Amino acid sequence: MGRKWANIKEKKASKDKTNSRIYAKFGIEIYVAAKSGDPDPHSNQKLRFVIERAKTYNVPKHIIDRAIEKAKGTGDETYSELRYEGFGPNGSMIIVDALTNNVNRTASDVRAAYSKNGGNMGVSGSVAYMFDNTAIFGVEGKDADELLELLMEADIDVRDILDEDGQAIIYAEPEDFHKVQEGLKAAGIEEFTVAEIEMIPQNDIQLSGEDLEKFERLIDALEDLEDVQKVYHNVELED
């Protein structure tokens, strides 16, 4: 499980280097969530989830507010949520989640990123079955035993809690994301280093040499695409 957290941590660290791009992607995601229902996060669970995620990436409040205000307007811009599955070098598996207002453009861009960087797009379901959809929370200032006791007292079940890198990492069922989060907040835990629903690989693989270089180029190319929101994979990366 530690390696899985290391991969998530590495992904967050790499994205922190391109704040403007991250802010733009969250702006779209917040807009879509607000447009899909009530633009009030207190009554719109999907919107509340996206905002909580955005906070762990230090997205400024004015960007969040601007996206919500835009959703309150009369614009009818439509976005589609898409998932692409594929393969990289030497058994590596990749899942790409996108949010787009132009499906043809996004499909073409993702396919080109795969083909130009030694990968191949697969059909729906060709990769996802090797990943588990998982709610993940990172909490500083508490250890795993403390959080386990806290959650047990609140009658909240989770998959696992581990101490990693000076913080406790909680793994739970995706449908329990809000239940776990509200339980933690009721206990006075308001800040999270991570608050995500991630596709976690059931097994990690290691790459080296040219295979690793090709894989990293492929991941960079996919994450750089305007419409791509998340990229998951099964490669163990170094901290």
Curated annotation (Swiss-Prot):
Secretion signal: which residues? none
Location relative to the cell:
Cytoplasm
InterPro entries linked to this entry:
Integrase-like_N, TACO1_YebC-like_2nd/3rd_dom, TACO1_YebC_N, Transcrip_reg_TACO1-like, Transcrip_reg_TACO1-like_dom3, Transcrip_reg_TACO1_YeeN, YebC-like
Q: Name one GO biological process term.
A: regulation of DNA-templated transcription
Enumerate the UniProt keywords alphabetically.
Answer: Cytoplasm, DNA-binding, Transcription, Transcription regulation
Q: Mind telling me which Pfam families this protein's record contains?
A: TACO1_YebC_N, Transcrip_reg
**Matching HAMAP family:** Transcrip_reg_TACO1, Transcrip_reg_TACO1_YeeN
Q: What family does the Swiss-Prot or TrEMBL record give for this protein?
A: Belongs to the TACO1 family. YeeN subfamily.
What name does this protein carry?
Probable transcriptional regulatory protein lmo0369
The scientific name of the source species is Listeria monocytogenes serovar 1/2a (strain ATCC BAA-679 / EGD-e)
